[in-house]
Amino acid sequence: MLTKLTIRNFKCFRDVEVDLNDRVVFIGPNNSGKTTTMQALVLWENGLKRWCEKHAGRETARKRPGVTINRRDTVSIPHPSAKHYWHQLRTRNIGSINGKTQTSNVRIDLILEGIANDRTWRCGLEFDYANDESFYCRPLRCDEGKNPDRMEIPEEARGIQIAFLPPMSGLSTTETRLDQGAIHVRVGEGRTAEVLRNLCFRIAETKPGQWEKITGTIESLFGAVLGNPVYVKERGEIAMGYQQHGVDLDLSSGGRGLQQTLLILTYMYDNPKSIILLDEPDAHLEVLRQRQ
């Protein structure tokens, strides 16, 4: 379980601590940092994975260089330049000491804390700007010295998996079959309407038992009987429909509630044992709708 997230110099946040618990709902005005908090969790996980891939099984060396991360690899945080990750786009501090200009890097610090197996753990990462296309990631420094000791990466943190699901717009009428990597890229770019049939197809093909649970849930909630997704080789597309009141309909004919619920269920089953981050910017309008 995650308990707290500390964010420094990331996008709209200069320095903030976010208390986390078993289930958390972020509520606030537009552009107040709700999505940014989720993206900070995603960036922390991306950095940790890249670090562990390169330095797995090794002790953290004091002078070890950071792992390079390309901004295009952070598909859930799409920006035209890596500089947009930094608070107010500031990647360097410029000052003057005894008439001499002094510069220093502005680092993004992300510290995640949690509890696992009745033990508390704390894992901090720092990110240094390299250029518009990439940045460096390394374990968080423990002091501000020239060659600082660095925070150890706890074993409990290595197993954390985070899946970020942006809001869904209107469902596309056709959908080309995609590999898993392409699905993740489109989800990260917010193009969830282009992958719903692909997610259904993956679950139906690889996890038929879970697909039955999904279809049963949709039928009980919406009275719609989902058909199995079918790959149409001639067009390279995935076709899928449902039946309601004895009428066969294409999935694009379903209501937004049905489509969004199906997206959430398939995404959860496609990312088992993961912390699911759901971004729904229109959720605050539900109170207004109920008043009408």
Walk through the language-model features, giving the residues of each.
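Switch/communication elements of ASCE P-loop NTPase nucleotide-binding domains
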Residues: 1-57, 228-292
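Extended helical coiled-coil dimerization/tether regions that scaffold
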Residues: 111-115, 140-142, 146, 159-275, ...
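A short, surface-exposed beta-strand/turn
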Residues: 117-142, 261
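Short, ordered beta-strand-loop transition motifs
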Residues: 97-104, 129-131, 231-235
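Residues at beta-strand starts and edge strands
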Residues: 1, 14, 102-108, 119-121, ...
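Short, conserved catalytic or adaptor-binding loops enriched in Gly and charged residues
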Residues: 153-157
